[in-house]
């Protein structure tokens, strides 16, 4: 064979070999992704949860890998709730197989134990998980554009132009996790009792939270899903809590958790520039102690006159909510 012909054949041979290798790799990765989906389904069903997937269809060759999951149904083993959707797509980058993206392609119906249904829809609703190694979480998150929550049995719908939530290990301390939540341009479905003057439009709700003993959150116990986390000393540290709603514009800090009776236990410190509307709304709320109602109303009237700002100290201890040290109302168990 002439050298000239050899130099023509070698590149084509390498190209064909690379193409065949990529075809093999893509199909191997697709098969492995399907296997993991079915393994997760089997594991959930074995634990009492019901997971049903009508059909898995492969798409995206040669550049992308997308598994179309049709007729997905998830019924939790505890809590009595279930979720259903006609389609969700699992996207995997063949060059980054440890990063998976799940995108809702149809509305999601969530049914609670009491039969109430919330329909979830969005222009884009994406959940992603990125792993370090085989089983170490690097980051997980959910992002939605024009999110709509509609409960057909209730008046109105909740709308948020943008919602982003992420969780990742906190590099500053082993066993702690950072949780971030940011919702912008929110429209509430209906007025909030005693806060009617604040309106339905919430410009922003943002939280930066550190969860201690985060791994214990996943160790649910029957009838007490957060029991292991609470008993293990789990707490939440609010490094920032921002709320821009009507006359209330604040960014505070605090910490909290649950007591042995599953009631809120902790403290928030919220700087408020215009405290009168906030104090008035709290005073007019349900189940407020009569003495606290009078004290809060007088305090609100004083701030109307002075126009001063305030740093609200809100505490929850021994089953009682306190504002500026005043016992305001009893606190029921969270669940």
Language-model segments: residues:
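Flexible, membrane-facing loop/turn or short amphipathic-helix motifs
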Residues: 73-81, 108-119, 146-158, 187-199, ...
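Extended lipid/amphipathic-ligand handling interfaces
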Residues: 56-59, 85-95, 121-135, 158-174, ...
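N-terminal beta-strand/beta-hairpin edge segment
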Residues: 46-174
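Extended terminal
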Residues: 2-13, 54-55, 224-235, 241-244, ...
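Hydrophobic membrane-insertion alpha-helices, especially the h-region
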Residues: 8-26
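Short, hydrophobic/aromatic-rich segments at coil-to-beta transitions
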Residues: 66, 138-141, 176-180, 233-240
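Alpha-helical transmembrane signal-anchor/signal-peptide segments
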Residues: 28-45
